[in-house]
Structure formats: C-alpha cells, structure tokens
Amino acid sequence: MVIFGLSRAIRKAKKNPIIAEIKVYSPKYGDLLRGRDPLRILRAYEEAGAVGISYITDQKYFKGSFDFLKVLCKETTLPVLRKDFITSKEEIEKTAEVGASAVLLITRILKDKLPEFVDYAKEHGLDTLVEVHTEDELKLAIKTNSTMIGINNRDIGKLEMDDGDVSLTEILAPKIPGKFVKVSESGIATLEDLKRALRVADAALIGTALMKAENPAELLKKFVEAEI
C-alpha cells in the first residue's frame, strides 16, 4: 500500500481522475451486479483508466462484504477506497490491515469525533475522504486534517434514494480550501454532469452509472478521456 495513495494519484493524474465504484446493490435501483463477476468489472475499470477503485462494504443496505474488500486489495495495484458507515477505530485498523488506501468518514455520523477519526486513520497511512452534504457539515470537515473532502450530491440519510445532482458540488466545492482534494460523489451519470463536477472539484466518484451501463469500461473510458 502506498501511503495516501489515492489523494496522490488524483493530484498526479494526467486525465480526468475518476474513482470507479464496484457497487453490488443500490437501495434505489436494486441489484447492480446482475450476475457479473466483480473482478471482471475491476479489470474493466483498470483498463479504462480509473484513478482508484471504490467499494462499499456495508452489508445491510448495499449488500457489500469486508471479505471482498480483502480480495479487491490483493487483486489491484490501484488505490482502493473503503466506503461504509464507519463508527469505530477498530474498523479503521481493519481497513488499513487489508491494504486499502483510503477510508470514507461521514461527517453526519461522526460529528464531534470526526477530527479524532481522521487523525487515527492518517496515523495508519490511510487517506481520509470526509463526506459532507451540507454547508454546516463542510464547516466541520475543513477543520480536520483530512487529505480529501467528498461532496455527496445525494443524501446518505435517505440512502441515496433522492435525486441529488452535481449542483450541490457547484455550491460547496468552491468553499473548500485548496489543501484538500475535492471529490464530487454520486449523481454523476452523463458527460455534462462530469464536466460540471470537474470544473470545481479535483475528482469524481462514479458508481451507479457505470454499474448500470451495458459496457462499464466503455463509459468509464469516455469519462476519463473527455475534454473538460
């Protein structure tokens, strides 16, 4: 594992930095894997030029598994982001132990514990993607030592069942200091969405649109190579 591998890869990217998500299930759209081998999707993402790979380990709502995260980290040289509803330091330790590069920390869940969890994750060599959805959450996030701040265009409190779009990124990203890598998450389905997001953010995290596509690699390649 390269220390802070994801934020470094985004900073150094020559093309559009897309964190491509292997998303098994969506509360809104149901089964996204549709019988496909997730490792074949991983290979497709690698070949199409993803800057990193995201995977949701939450089992209850997104049908992910920690065991597959372990497999993923062994199978790819790309930085891997673990997404989950992290509430304990033990989960951070486990994330680092299996070789992930980054961990999602949700401001709404951690609240006052956020700075402490960010520092703990960084001590373990992990990039921290601190997720925000409101201006008040952003005020908390920018007080931390996080390497990255993610703007979730959808409301995780509603399990992404809402129709959020990149307009939230356009509002919040300009308020984030340059020392943070800014990531626009969720609600990016078209080239126009991506262009709007990357005009104000450093990277985009895309899952549902890629997983719903008949040819995820083809769509990702289009996103990675698009003129912004």
UniProtKB/Swiss-Prot annotation:
Enzyme Commission code: 4.1.1.48
Stretches of the chain forming a coiled coil according to its record: none
GO biological process, any: L-tryptophan biosynthetic process
Keyword field contains Repressor: no
Entry-linked InterPro entries: Aldolase_TIM, Indole-3-glycerol_P_synth, Indole-3-glycerol_P_synth_dom, Indole-3-GlycerolPSynthase_CS, RibuloseP-bd_barrel
Database matches in SUPFAM superfamilies: Ribulose-phoshate binding barrel
Protein's name according to its UniProt entry: Indole-3-glycerol phosphate synthase
